[in-house]
Structures are given as structure tokens and as C-alpha cells.
Regions:
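Hydrophobic faces of well-ordered beta-strands that scaffold small-molecule active sites
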Residues: 62-64, 94, 119-123, 146-150, ...
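Anion (oxyanion) recognition and catalysis
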Residues: 87-90, 142, 190, 197
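Acidic, His- and aromatic-enriched active-site or binding-groove loops in soluble protein domains
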Residues: 118, 122-126, 226-229
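A general structural detector for well-ordered alpha-helical segments in enzyme core domains, enriched
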Residues: 78-85, 134-137, 188-192
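Auxiliary Fe-S-binding modules of radical SAM enzymes
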Residues: 1-8, 29, 154, 159-229
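Active-site beta-loop-alpha junctions enriched in small/polar residues
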Residues: 67-69, 99-101, 124-128, 151-153, ...
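Histidine/lysine/aspartate-rich catalytic loop segments that bind and position anionic ligands
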Residues: 123-127, 131, 136-170, 175
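Conserved Radical SAM active-site core
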Residues: 1-14, 18-119, 128-131, 157-168, ...
Length: 229
């Protein structure tokens, strides 16, 4: 997984943020996650090797903003430049993830039209409340590619009505990590997987999280490699 964080930092806005892994990691490093700043890796997709070729070659996927939210308010002053970088690499795929679905439309670039071919817009759906809040907004937006991430999955979600539209092409799912991690139940992930299968939507379960419940048993899993298996 290639991650591009053009800026760092965010504000907690919903239940999925309660035990945010970035707040945990930043706290260990003495960083205030609530302070949003532009990173030194802002131009990462455009970086080149000594021979002049791109450091990140054609065909790669970049997950954008995993230490922030691409649509966080403080980044409004930098986002147009980030859009220009994204547009300059039509040979790559950029996966933009947000909990701020309500801000997407007004933050799109002027030449967005019906979407950039190399951008997948994705919202977080940690529980039913947020799925019902964010997915209708996503479905109303113009975009060539749409998806959602049920992580941290902290409750069962029924999303068949959204998958049935045919607009959602990619779903990721996973549990919560680090201090205070809430349980992720196997049955919740299995249900979501079956819903995606019914509507032929790509589904990937990326990790169990620290606290995973299956068949009535609770497993505390601290090894990230074990989680992803």
C-alpha cells in the first residue's frame, strides 16, 4: 500500500474517530494531531529518480490522506494544488478517503466535470448511522469511481440499498487498533461481504483490528501481520 499524506492532522467528528490511530501514534511522538500542517512530502506523486523517471511508476495506487482527511477544513488553502498534482498523474489511481462527505462537493476542482478517471472517492462508514449519512451524499456526487471503507467497523451495517445503485465499486472493511480498540465482530464483516457479493462489488477485509470477536470468543490481536491474515 502506497500512502500519500499531502497534509497531516485532523479533528474528530464522528464515532469512528473516537480512538483514532493517528492520535495514538502522534501522542507517542509528542505531536498534536488537531493541528493540521502541510507535509514535506506534498509533491510525492511527482517526485522523480535521478534518471528522470517517476519514483512512483505508472499503474500504482495511492491511498491519500491516511494521517488526515483530504477534505479537512484547514487544507482548503492547499487542496487546489493537490488536485493539480493528481491531475498531472493520470496514469495512477488516487483513493481519496473522507468522513467529511458534506464538504466534498464544494471542494472539488473547477474542471472536475463528472470526475477524474484516476480518482476513487470513498467515504468512511463505521456504523449504520454514518453509512446512512454519508453514502447518500456520495451517490449524489459526480465521480467516475466510488467506494466506501467500513473501518473501524464498530457495528453491523446494512447497505444493500446503496450497493444496488451500481455506483459503488469498491468496499474495504476492518477493525480498530491500539488503545481502547472497540470489538469488530466477524458476523458484521461476513454480512457486509455477502451484501457486496450479491451486487458484485469488490470487497476486501483488510484487518481484524486489536479486538476481534468470532463464534462468541474475543481475540486480542496485537500483531499487525496476524490481523491482516
Amino acid at each position: 500500500m502506497i500512502i500519500w499524506n499531502p497534509w497531516h492532522g485532523c479533528h474528530k467528528i464522528s464515532e469512528g474517530c473516537e480512538h483514532c490511530y493517528m492520535y495514538f501514534l502522534d501522542r507517542k511522538r509528542g505531536i498534536d494531531t488537531a493541528k493540521v500542517f502541510k507535509t514535506g512530502n506534498f509533491d510525492m506523486p511527482l517526485q522523480r529518480k535521478r534518471d528522470g523517471s517517476y519514483k512512483y511508476p505508472s499503474g500504482m495506487e495511492m491511498y491519500v490522506g491516511l494521517s488526515t482527511d483530504f477534505f479537512v477544513e484547514e487544507a482548503d488553502v492547499w487542496r487546489d494544488e493537490a488536485w493539480r498534482i493528481i491531475k498531472a498523474r493520470p496514469d495512477m489511481v488516487f483513493r481519496l478517503l473522507t468522513k467529511r462527505a458534506h464538504r466534498i462537493e464544494k471542494c472539488l476542482p473547477k474542471d472536475w466535470g463528472d470526475g477524474y478517471e484516476n480518482v476513487l472517492l470513498s467515504v468512511t462508514t463505521e456504523n449504520q448511522k454514518r453509512a446512512d449519512e454519508r453514502l447518500p451524499i456520495l451517490l449524489e456526487l459526480p465521480a467516475k469511481h466510488k467506494g466506501f471503507m467500513a473501518a473501524p467497523l464498530i457495528g453491523p451495517i446494512e447497505v444493500s440499498c446503496y450497493l444496488a445503485t451500481g455506483q459503488i465499486e469498491d468496499v474495504l472493511c476492518g477493525g480498530e487498533n491500539y488503545d481502547g480498540a472497540r470489538p469488530c465482530h466477524y458476523e458484521w464483516a461476513k454480512s457486509l461481504s455477502e451484501q457486496c457479493k450479491k451486487y458484485q462489488v469488490s470487497f476486501n477485509f483488510i484487518e481484524t483490528g486489536t479486538c476481534f470477536v468470532k463464534d462468541g470468543k474475543t481475540y486480542m490481536i496485537h500483531d499487525k501481520q496476524v490481523q491482516s491474515k
